[in-house]
Amino acid sequence: MADLQAEKKLVLNYFSEIDSCDIESLTEVISKYASEDFSMKCTHPFNELGSADIVANNLWRPIKDSFSPIQRRLDIFYAGINSLDKNKGKWISSMGHFMGVFNKPFVGLKPNNKSILLRFAEFYKVENNKITEGAIFLDVMNLMQQLGLSIIPQSSGLVCVTPGPMNHKGLKFNTSNQNESQKTLDLIHRMRDRLVKGSKMQSYKEELELDWHNDMIWWGPGGIGASYTIDGYQKGHTKPFQDGLEFVRFNGHILSSAEDDLGGWFGWPNLIMKPKGEYLGLTNASDIESEMRVVDLYRRQGDKLAENWIFIDHLHFLKKLGVDLLERAKFLNQ
């Protein structure tokens, strides 16, 4: 695994300038750090964006304009070589919250003029000292829950502000032990293969116990919430997930990397699923297939996994099933 300190510094400087610049300077800042063919994959309703100007005006302008002043609160930051790209791609992965005062409408959501925490996961590929592509997952459904919108049914897990790693060592600003990084990557790949290839997205306790500590914590996305212990995870997530959805196929990931005890991936989409019943209290059984864009970040403790942070682009997934939560929110505003 390569030394990626220069790539870390580049992305940290990018974060600093994006967060501190005025809105009219966004395109200039992005152009300074990004390649000419820079593009981003974003959760709905932003979706796929190309060019510095489009990313500036379609993504960062509404974020900075709606939640002002914005503060980036990082809980996870690490670098790794993409194991899915012939071990060539250099990627920076991060997670945390954007804090701000919600004082202007955001994706049609009515502001409450109070402080909010917008949960995010962000990924950037760096080549030749330029950011060439990126992805950002915003947990808009969690924001809806913070706002108390009635369109979101009660979650099966704990709804809370998602913390970072329990050991408070989520920010890998310095170099890490390459052997520990490889251990993490091997473990999450073993767990992935057991779940996807062996069990077809079915989670059995005896298999979970092979890869997870019993007191694991599953920090789920908006609409689901967090679960504690293997038993709690099965009750709060896997049973409702398996009861409500039918697995169609696994599409793979775009990125899979690790550094020290942290690792993870994202896909676009990772999974194709269709509802076989009620999922999140919002779907009915149908033959319509829909795409799940998912982020999974993990913390390894010893030879098993201890924590998992998840983002699911539920707005995109549900819209393809005829459930448009942003339109429902606009109706509430009226």
Language-model regions, residue ranges each:
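C-terminal and inter-domain tail/linker signature
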Residues: 1-334
